[in-house]
Amino acid sequence: MTDLTAAAQRALSLMDLTTLNDNDTDEKVTALCHQAKSLAGNTAAICIYPRFIPLARKVLREQGTPEIRIATVTNFPHGHDDIDIALAETQAAIAYGADEVDVVFPYRALMASNEQVGFEMVKACKVACAEADVLLKVIIETGELKEASLIRKASEISINAGADFIKTSTGKVPVNATLASAEIMMKVIHEMGVGETVGFKPAGGVRTAEEAAQYLALADHIMGDKWVDARHFRFGASSLLGNLLNTLGHQGQKQSSHY
């Protein structure tokens, strides 16, 4: 097994296979569930809009992969600063049966020097998730924050408020995951000493096995080569799957989405 095929195999098992499009349908979500089960192994999770969760749960169970987790999104994609709405959406996602919730941090508020609303939003969502044993990922939207100091601050606030994961991006803005932002975020996890409990998720723009391998190498370098597993690292992606399967010698159905 070459280094690239090893990285591809690793990346496949860490994927949150995603469809978050306005034109998503029951048929598209069903197809996504089928794709999450491949000849090369299963993805860690799928990530879909909340209304599709009951359908996905049924499809995953019927195809014999109930262990594939279901993630969804709240306060998405704009990251507004209304805590009550973000919390209500998160509670609704939990009621739909989500295993994981990816909530968008109110990043514009932070850019306007309001640190408190982000802390309070993440904390409120964490309380709701913890009661239901649901994992909370916080999307800080690095491509909009841009500045290293803001990316660092959003990461710190999210972790201090109880995030189980910090995630780069919604995939809905011009700049999504980058190695530079990934380095900042993982260094925060490392420097805060929370690597046991807090994971990292690059999302959007990771489309090839080569790109995935770069993120995995960076994680191994910063966090140590025993850290990366599905509890501590995920890729948010859709088109990546087809490339990974090709790299592994399996011609898979490719996603049309460009997340």
UniProtKB/Swiss-Prot annotation:
Q: Which residues form the active site?
A: 102 (proton donor/acceptor), 167 (schiff-base intermediate with acetaldehyde), 201 (proton donor/acceptor)
**Any matching Pfam family:** DeoC
User: What keywords are annotated for this sequence in UniProt?
Assistant: Cytoplasm, Lyase, Schiff base
**What is the predominant subcellular site recorded for this chain?**
cytoplasm
Look up keyword Chloroplast and say if it applies: no
Its annotated pathway? Carbohydrate degradation; 2-deoxy-D-ribose 1-phosphate degradation; D-glyceraldehyde 3-phosphate and acetaldehyde from 2-deoxy-alpha-D-ribose 1-phosphate: step 2/2
Task: Please provide, alphabetically and separated by semicolons, the GO molecular function terms listed in this UniProt record.
Answer: deoxyribose-phosphate aldolase activity
Which biological process, per GO, is one annotated for this protein? carbohydrate catabolic process
Which InterPro entries does this UniProt record tie to the protein?
Aldolase_TIM (IPR013785), DeoC (IPR011343), DeoC/FbaB/LacD_aldolase (IPR002915), DeoC_typeII (IPR023649)
**Enzyme class (EC, first level):** lyase
Q: Give the catalytic activity.
A: 2-deoxy-D-ribose 5-phosphate = D-glyceraldehyde 3-phosphate + acetaldehyde
- What are the record's GO terms for cellular component? cytoplasm
- What's the Enzyme Commission number for this chain? 4.1.2.4
Q: Where in the cell is it found?
A: Cytoplasm
Keyword Lyase assigned: yes
Query: What PANTHER family does the record point to?
Result: DEOXYRIBOSE-PHOSPHATE ALDOLASE
Q: What family is it from?
A: Belongs to the DeoC/FbaB aldolase family. DeoC type 2 subfamily.
Q: Tell me the function of this protein.
A: Catalyzes a reversible aldol reaction between acetaldehyde and D-glyceraldehyde 3-phosphate to generate 2-deoxy-D-ribose 5-phosphate.
Record-given protein name: Deoxyribose-phosphate aldolase
Q: Which organism is it from?
A: Photorhabdus laumondii subsp. laumondii (strain DSM 15139 / CIP 105565 / TT01) (Photorhabdus luminescens subsp. laumondii)
Q: Which gene encodes it?
A: deoC
